A protein has these predicted regions:
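Conserved N-terminal diphosphate/IPP-binding helix and adjacent helical/loop segment
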Residues: 1-82, 86, 90-105, 141, ...
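Active-site helix-to-loop segments that bind/position phosphate- or nucleotide-bearing substrates
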Residues: 178
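Divalent-cation-assisted or electrostatically stabilized phosphate/pyrophosphate-binding catalytic cores
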Residues: 97-119, 161-175, 202
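Inter-helical turn/loop segments and adjacent helix faces that build the functional surface
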Residues: 60-66, 126-138, 153-166, 170, ...
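Conserved small/polar residues in nucleotide/adenosyl-binding loops
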Residues: 219-221
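Residue-level signal for inorganic ion chemistry
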Residues: 52, 123, 149
């Protein structure tokens, strides 16, 4: 297995359904947000984070069946991730992301900020409707980490002497916290024990950090 596409093949159809559902959830009743959602979720991308949540959810299910709550958790994970990217692009004044126009360059900064805010709000609403306070705590922590990570990145933007541990800590806040806590949340929804919850958290954290280190290395090679 050499590609992300191969990795996510067992949940390929579920991911297609997820993107369609996200477009409907986010754009309903809001023409501008509908256009922004169509742009965001039609741009392709690996969909690695919701894909891993779906794979984990299937793996820990006795009958390898995804429940509606696990599917919604994957949608929430992608909403939070996408919202953070929209805001990051505004802060970084980036005109493209992986060859695709960013929301603020396609529309304007006001629409981008509001679209990101709306995604975070939608994620919070659907998170609350999972009716599981422990899952709410996990994903609420993620949103705090995202803001903290962005602040750390901007404070150390020109620090050429930044240590590897500081880089890892910043990367955890900006990206790894989301997949780590989402994987753990999948386990919480399945009612598995604390030891296995910790294993799910560590798996999500380490796979994301490894991905970020490799991605950064490829940029500088």
């Amino acid at each position: 297995m050499n590609t992300v596409t191969e990795l996510l093949q067992p949940v390929e159809n579920d991911l297609d359904d997820l993107i369609l559902e996200l477009k409907n959830l986010i754009g309903a009743g809001h023409p501008i947000l509908q256009a922004a959602a169509e742009h965001l979720f039609s741009a392709g991308g690996k969909r690695l984070r919701p894909g891993i949540v779906l794979l984990i959810s299937k793996a820990i299910s006795p009958e390898f069946i995804l429940t509606s709550k696990h599917k919604r958790l994957a949608e929430i994970t992608e909403m939070i991730h996408t919202a953070s990217l929209v805001h990051d692009d505004v802060v970084d004044e980036a005109s493209t992301r992986r060859g695709v126009d960013t929301v603020h360059s396609r529309f304007n900064t006001r629409v981008a900020v509001l679209a990101g805010d709306f995604l975070f709000a939608q994620a919070s609403w659907h998170l609350a409707n999972l009716d599981n306070v422990n899952v709410v705590k996990l994903l609420s922590r993620v949103i705090m980490d995202l803001a903290e990570g962005e602040i750390k990145q901007n404070l150390n933007r020109f620090d050429s002497a930044q240590s590897f541990s500081k880089y890892i800590n910043k990367s955890y806040c900006k990206t790894a916290s989301l997949i780590a806590n989402s994987c753990k949340a999948a386990g919480v929804l399945s009612g598995i024990n604390d030891e296995n919850l910790t294993s799910l958290y560590d798996f999500g954290k380490n796979i994301d950090l490894a991905f970020q280190v490799v991605d950064l290395s490829l940029i500088h090679i």
